[in-house]
């Protein structure tokens, strides 16, 4: 089998080319603007304000580098030391000294960009712990208010029923749990507050109704690959075989805000229903991809749920406030009891794809994570960037089998589920003819960009792999 090359920023007509030429300069400009706004609150701290001016100047210069398509430079020894930059970046640039912003692997350059931005803040002691993307994370979560409240109310309503079902297992109960499992998976998949129609039927009778089945069928129509059933089988088998042993589910996280909230909601469902006994969340160690989850973002989210100025749901006695407080309290209990655990690792913010989650990758924690994730019953990889790293961000034919596209992960003992709303050029595992059909459909509204249907966020995939050599 010939392994195809990766998507490049020079590939004409691709979303990667558009990202490098248009989106990245905008992202850096937004960071400059947000830094300026934050500086207004720091004027009394002269040192911090002046250091902010230095960062702002350097961000402007960096933005111009991207626009001018200058060569990507290695990190200096000082930068590596100050910001704990993994040496993998310089190793790549040593092998590819000719690359510039307009002609480089998209995956490498995008990850490199966020490392460069982080270095600028780490150099200035007053700003070393500052998350330049935090304001945007917060404002986006705040705008999800109605979805957050609705999901909290649904969870509160389901909680006693879940506990009852856990105490009285059986085939009929499993049928209901299976429906709920699919719905919580989909909420986590889409990761936004516009898809909560899934849980509008919250009673067990409604879930079993014809109307409920129709709503689910409609919601699944945009999921072009759907292996949810296989994940369900893995967890129910683990539950049957458990005999008091741990049932572990890992989440390799994507976005903070509502998506993290939805991921926590899925974890709470798994724990309350007995489909899992422990959930481990893997976060990023630096501000990354604008909205990715860092360890601090969990505490911020729980605080936001209780903050009646952030989420103005009325007096503490209102049902909305009670539901938000209940879920915040549930999360704290799960964390304090060890049922939910958060971890971070620099591997997730290197440019290395997940073919390096392997016993042979001994330099950047790939082997350590591989050994650990083998202990998990199911590893859920969230979002588009994780999908790109799973597939190597390569130019696979779109009908390529999932097991082929994820390389060593297909057989190295990690049971995985990728939940991805499609926002990049790479796409695999499609049945014959579907790519042409969707390209034609997207072309009608977006002339010349039919193949971008898989970059639009309008479709999604749920891809499972047992990790077992067949």
From Swiss-Prot:
GO terms for biological process: DNA damage response. Substrate binds at residues 23, 110, 254-255, 384-388, 423. GO terms for cellular component: cytoplasm; nucleus. Changing residue 292 to A: Abolishes catalytic activity. Changing residue 254 to A: Abolishes catalytic activity. Mn(2+) binds at residues 254-255, 292. Induction: Expression is up-regulated in response to treatment with the DNA-damaging agent methyl methanesulfonate (MMS). Its EC number is 3.1.3.-. Disruption phenotype: Leads to the accumulation of fructose-1-phosphate. Leads to increased DNA damage or decreased repair. Belongs to the damage-control phosphatase family. Sugar phosphate phosphatase III subfamily. Keywords: Hydrolase, Manganese, Metal-binding, Nickel. Changing residue 255 to A: Abolishes catalytic activity. Gene3D superfamilies: 1.20.930.60, Uncharacterised protein PF01937, DUF89, domain 3. This is Damage-control phosphatase YMR027W. Changing residue 192 to A: Abolishes catalytic activity. Its cofactor is Mn(2+); Ni(2+). Phosphatase activity is strongly promoted by several divalent cations but it is suggested that Mn(2+) and possibly Ni(2+) represent biologically relevant metal ion cofactors for damage-control phosphatases. InterPro entries: ARMT-1-like_metal-bd_sf (IPR036075), ARMT1 (IPR039763), ARMT1-like_metal-bd (IPR002791). Subfamily III proteins have a conserved RTxK motif about 40-50 residues from the C-terminus; the threonine may be replaced by serine or cysteine. It catalyses: beta-D-fructose 1-phosphate + H2O = D-fructose + phosphate; beta-D-fructose 6-phosphate = dihydroxyacetone + D-glyceraldehyde 3-phosphate. A motif (Subfamily III RTxK motif) lies at residues 420-423. GO terms for molecular function: fructose 6-phosphate aldolase activity; fructose-1-phosphatase activity; metal ion binding; phosphatase activity. Present with 6190 molecules/cell in log phase SD medium. Activity is strongly promoted by Co(2+), Ni(2+) and Mn(2+). Activity is inhibited by EDTA. Metal-dependent phosphatase that shows phosphatase activity against several substrates, including fructose-1-phosphate and fructose-6-phosphate. Its preference for fructose-1-phosphate, a strong glycating agent that causes DNA damage rather than a canonical yeast metabolite, suggests a damage-control function in hexose phosphate metabolism.
